[in-house]
């Protein structure tokens, strides 16, 4: 894998406090990472201007709002996300087959081939078997992840968000063309933070991840550009 292929796999999580910081990171990294992730906190604070700021720098956006509501509401929200010009958007697979089908159909109908790719969140990387048990799910994490990934594929979703530990299982169950976006990726120079099911960038790519969501190891670095370059180095070295 060459450096350009490796950098395109990196999604930088914009866990920042406002437009000025978005502008700074987008200016620094738009030609060094594949995409920028905008999540609930940032979008709630800054709204669509967060997306517009990244796009002004030529960056691509993963809008990570994890929609989970009645089918019609989620479909309308997904359409609004698509109208912002994002490349990836997601919802919770636990919302069920009808919710996912309705959203996927609505976006395909309005945008066709120019649509964003739609992802379903399986089980959050902070979750454990005990987390699931306490909400009444008595199946192992890995089993639930694969079950939800297969449901998402059946519903017409383009891929899933899942921990790196389940990449291989999802790839086996859902095939080579199903997108896998994985948080919980930590380069060798970074701490584990609050993620429970983690993996190194090169291991995740070898397992079959299409995109790696990485935030704090880049944002907390004294030199974010150098941090990205080090992550690219790890991917290239581990994925010849």
UniProtKB/Swiss-Prot annotation:
Keywords: Decarboxylase, Lyase, Pyrimidine biosynthesis. The active site is at 66 (proton donor). Substrate binds at residues 15, 37, 64-73, 125, 186, 195, 215-216. Pathway: Pyrimidine metabolism; UMP biosynthesis via de novo pathway; UMP from orotate: step 2/2. GO terms for molecular function: orotidine-5'-phosphate decarboxylase activity. It is an enzyme of class 4 (lyase). SMART domains: OMPdecase (SM00934). It holds the Pfam family OMPdecase. GO terms for biological process: 'de novo' pyrimidine nucleobase biosynthetic process; 'de novo' UMP biosynthetic process. Belongs to the OMP decarboxylase family. Type 1 subfamily. Catalyzes the decarboxylation of orotidine 5'-monophosphate (OMP) to uridine 5'-monophosphate (UMP). This is Orotidine 5'-phosphate decarboxylase. It comes from Pelobacter propionicus (strain DSM 2379 / NBRC 103807 / OttBd1).
């Amino acid at each position: 894998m060459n450096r350009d292929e490796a950098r395109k796999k990196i999604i930088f999580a914009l866990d920042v406090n406002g437009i000025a910081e978005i502008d700074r990171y987008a200016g620094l990294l738009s030609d060094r990472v594949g995409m920028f992730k905008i999540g609930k906190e940032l979008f709630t604070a800054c709204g669509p201007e967060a997306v517009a700021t990244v796009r002004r720098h030529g960056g691509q956006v993963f809008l990570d709002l994890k929609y989970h509501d009645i089918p019609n509401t989620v479909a309308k929200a997904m359409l609004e996300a698509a109208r912002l010009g994002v490349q990836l958007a997601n919802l919770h697979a636990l919302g069920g087959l009808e919710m996912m089908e309705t959203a996927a159909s609505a976006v395909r109908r309005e945008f066709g081939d120019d649509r964003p790719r739609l992802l379903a969140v399986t089980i959050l990387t902070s979750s454990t078997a005990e987390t699931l048990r306490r909400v009444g799910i008595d199946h192992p994490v890995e089993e639930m992840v694969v079950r939800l990934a297969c449901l998402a594929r059946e519903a017409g979703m383009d891929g899933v968000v899942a921990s790196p530990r389940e990449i291989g299982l999802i790839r086996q169950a859902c095939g080579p063309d199903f997108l896998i976006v994985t948080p919980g990726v930590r380069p060798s120079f970074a701490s584990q933070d609050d993620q429970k099911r983690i993996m190194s960038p090169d291991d995740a790519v070898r397992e079959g991840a299409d995109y790696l969501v990485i935030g704090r190891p880049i944002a907390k670095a004294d030199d974010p550009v150098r941090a990205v370059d080090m992550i690219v180095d790890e991917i290239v070295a581990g994925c010849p």
